[in-house]
């Protein structure tokens, strides 16, 4: 196939007028069938491959049919922030309306909606929060739960909540949209007499699937070799590489950047781009940038690119065959991320990314036998995570007996019991399992982790609300230090050490944040000191939201300590992280109050300091050990009142 023809094919969709693009989408010919199904049934399940137009067109069909004219607006949930924002902007373009006007979006810490908004894209967590203030979702005439197959904790919660709302609102409609969900299970859950299922048929371009003849010893290095081989051998077309996590992505990008130095002049110049949840939405949006013919995008992504988003120009997919799965241990209160083989459903979704605009190829870095042994579907998050957020949410809705909630899949009892115990010891639940007043009620209204929320809500008693606001924001935003893997690693350590505090990691992070604000939030200052500018900017945004949160309960937010004594800050944090304490053992490890052996994370400023007593914010389990993070030095006598309560 001539290169000129391929280049033209790649740009066809981009250069086609919007109205023609919409007509070319497979879902367009199902418009009337969809509207009739929604009119006649409370619940409509729409099955269709990624890219058929479900996410962008269904809300527009409903808007044009009058579903947002009188009784409420149209809501569309997404599991991921990137999708909610990017799709909203795309639909605004198609409607010839300014973003945030007729169509808007709402994601955590970022909202672009107005009184004129009739179509609202949002993360599933945002809709859950709205239920606190609008229990029957009376603002909405219809809600579309998109990508329901991803089975996040929020999605599963929404399924149960929406089932209850449907029982009380005959005028309410629900659309469940997915590329690969089991429609029969959903129909049985909601009641088959209420459900209509329709499939969107649409022909993808042919995709050639290539398997390995024998297993690879290192799929990450194999992915890099495959990318370089594609660039030197195959015609133009962008490349999408599926990996399991951030470290693998960063490793591959560095290797590709290094390879560009020795690349042949006959090849296109590769433009390596990351795509994972650790990036800001603006950073994620870079994958949609269009480059001229001398350049070839290679996107290294987690499963975020499996569904929901369609990146024009992808012709080649490299599938590692692995994904990260979080496993929660209710006995140790720790979680670990492990590499697991993907499901067959995910493998099919990944290969489909190559056939969007022209013929494609998928390079599966595993054998046909490995594929045959894969599970059909991935496990739901509700089976493998801490249940504290779920319990808080349901208690906030006034549910006395959690087991009466209509779970699509019931969480393990041991996970629920662990969450109930933790929330009781934190003072969020009373002995009857009800929210305490005011603390429990306030925490149930917070988007923060319950431990951080308690520290924040009690900070005025310690006179350090100003500092705890900043700390809560940093802990929520993520890692403030940028740790390069290059020759500048030592320079970064020297820069970071100027912020180190004897009290530990959290006061160190507070030093960074306050210095960032004191240096006028300057990007160049962050680069000079090897700090994550985007994380610090996000922490500022989170802090603004937290100030508003405290204002709702008339809690003063300007209180700050008059001196450099950090003990009150640490005592306040201990009020929230009372279970997360440990004392030093002879072998250098630590023993928690629950008797578990843990080790300090190597990145901690207290690593190898042999601090007698510590407090930590989180624990991560490896194959053989438990590591604690965000560590602070505490005094043993601070624990007296808490130990008395536990006994």
From Swiss-Prot:
A motif (DEAH box) lies at residues 146-149. It is found in: Nucleus. It catalyses: ATP + H2O = ADP + phosphate + H(+). ATP binds at residues 48-55. Its main location: nucleus. The keyword Glycoprotein does not apply. Residues 35-199 form the Helicase ATP-binding domain. InterPro entries: DEAD-box_helicase_OB_fold, DEAD/DEAH_box_helicase_dom, DNA/RNA_helicase_DEAH_CS, HA2_WH, Helicase-assoc_dom, Helicase_ATP-bd, Helicase_C-like, P-loop_NTPase. GO terms for molecular function: ATP binding; ATP hydrolysis activity; RNA binding; RNA helicase activity. GO terms for cellular component: catalytic step 2 spliceosome; cytosol; nucleus; spliceosomal complex. One of its GO terms (biological process) is mRNA splicing, via spliceosome. It comes from the Eukaryota. Pfam families: DEAD (PF00270), HA2_C (PF21010), HA2_N (PF04408), Helicase_C (PF00271), OB_NTP_bind (PF07717). Keywords: ATP-binding, Helicase, Hydrolase, mRNA processing, mRNA splicing, Nucleotide-binding, Nucleus. Its EC number is 3.6.4.13. Residues 219-398 form the Helicase C-terminal domain. It is an enzyme of class 3 (hydrolase). Belongs to the DEAD box helicase family. DEAH subfamily. Pre-mRNA processing factor involved in disassembly of spliceosomes after the release of mature mRNA. This is Putative pre-mRNA-splicing factor ATP-dependent RNA helicase C20H4.09. The lineage of its organism: Eukaryota, Fungi, Dikarya, Ascomycota, Taphrinomycotina.
């Amino acid at each position: 196939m001539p290169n000129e023809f391929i280049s033209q094919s790649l740009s066809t969709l981009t250069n086609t007028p919007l109205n023609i693009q919409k007509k070319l989408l497979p879902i367009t010919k199902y418009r009337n069938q969809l509207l009739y199904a929604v009119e006649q049934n409370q619940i409509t399940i729409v099955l269709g491959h990624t890219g058929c137009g479900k996410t962008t067109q269904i809300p527009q069909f409903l808007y044009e049919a009058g579903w947002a004219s009188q009784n409420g607006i149209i809501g569309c949930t997404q599991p991921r922030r990137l999708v909610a924002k990017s799709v909203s902007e795309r639909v605004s373009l198609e409607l010839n309306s300014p973003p945030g006007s007729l169509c808007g979006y709402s994601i955590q810490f970022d909202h672009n909606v107005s009184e004129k908004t009739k179509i609202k894209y949002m993360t599933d967590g945002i809709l859950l929060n709205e239920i606190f203030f609008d229990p029957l979702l009376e603002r909405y005439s219809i809600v579309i739960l998109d990508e329901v197959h991803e089975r996040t904790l929020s999605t599963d919660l929404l399924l149960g909540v929406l089932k209850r709302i449907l029982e009380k609102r005959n005028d309410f409609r629900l659309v469940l949209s997915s590329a690969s969900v089991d429609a029969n299970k959903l129909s049985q859950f909601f009641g088959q007499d209420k459900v209509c299922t329709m499939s969107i048929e649409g022909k993808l371009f042919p995709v050639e699937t290539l398997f390995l003849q024998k297993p690879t010893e290192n799929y990450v290095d194999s992915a890099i070799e495959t990318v370089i081989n594609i660039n030197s051998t195959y015609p133009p077309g962008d490349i999408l590489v599926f990996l399991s996590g951030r470290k693998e992505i960063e490793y591959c990008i560095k290797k590709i950047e290094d390879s560009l130095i020795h690349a042949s002049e006959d090849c296109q110049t590769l433009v390596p781009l990351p795509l994972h949840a650790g990036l800001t939405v603006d950073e994620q949006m870079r994958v949609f940038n269009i480059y001229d013919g001398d350049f070839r995008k290679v996107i290294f992504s987690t499963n975020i690119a499996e569904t929901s988003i369609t990146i024009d120009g992808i012709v080649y997919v490299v599938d590692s065959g692995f994904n990260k799965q979080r496993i929660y241990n209710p006995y140790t209160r720790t979680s670990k991320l492990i590499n697991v083989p993907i499901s067959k459903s995910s493998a099919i979704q990944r290969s489909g990314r190559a056939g969007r605009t022209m013929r494609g190829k998928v390079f599966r870095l595993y054998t046909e036998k490995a594929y045959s042994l894969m599970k059909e579907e991935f496990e739901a998050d509700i089976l493998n995570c801490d249940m504290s957020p779920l319990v808080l949410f349901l208690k906030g809705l006034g549910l006395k007996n959690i087991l009466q909630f209509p779970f699509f899949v019931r969480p393990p009892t041991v996970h629920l019991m662990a969450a109930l115990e933790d929330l009781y010891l934190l003072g969020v639940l009373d002995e009857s399992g009800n929210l305490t007043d005011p603390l429990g009620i306030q925490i149930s209204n917070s988007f923060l982790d319950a431990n951080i929320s308690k520290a924040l809500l009690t900070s005025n008693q310690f006179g350090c609300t100003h500092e705890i606001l900043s700390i809560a924001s940093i802990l929520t935003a993520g890692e403030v230090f940028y740790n390069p893997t290059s020759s500048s690693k030592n320079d970064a350590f020297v820069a970071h050490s100027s912020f180190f505090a004897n009290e530990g990691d959290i006061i160190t992070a507070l030093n960074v944040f306050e210095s960032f604000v004191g240096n006028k939030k300057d990007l160049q200052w962050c680069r000079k000191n090897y700090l994550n500018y985007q994380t610090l900017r996000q922490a500022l945004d989170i802090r603004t939201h937290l100030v508003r949160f405290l204002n709702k309960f008339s809690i003063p937010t300007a209180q700050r300590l008059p001196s450099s004594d950090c003990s009150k800050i640490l005592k306040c944090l201990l009020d929230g992280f009372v279970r997360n304490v440990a004392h030093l053992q002879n072998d250098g490890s630590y023993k928690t109050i629950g008797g578990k052996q843990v080790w300090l994370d190597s990145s901690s400023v207290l690593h190898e300091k042999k601090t007698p007593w510590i407090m930590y914010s989180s624990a991560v389990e490896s194959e053989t050990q438990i590591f604690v993070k965000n560590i602070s030095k505490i005094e043993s006598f601070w624990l007296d009142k808490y130990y008395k309560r536990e006994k």
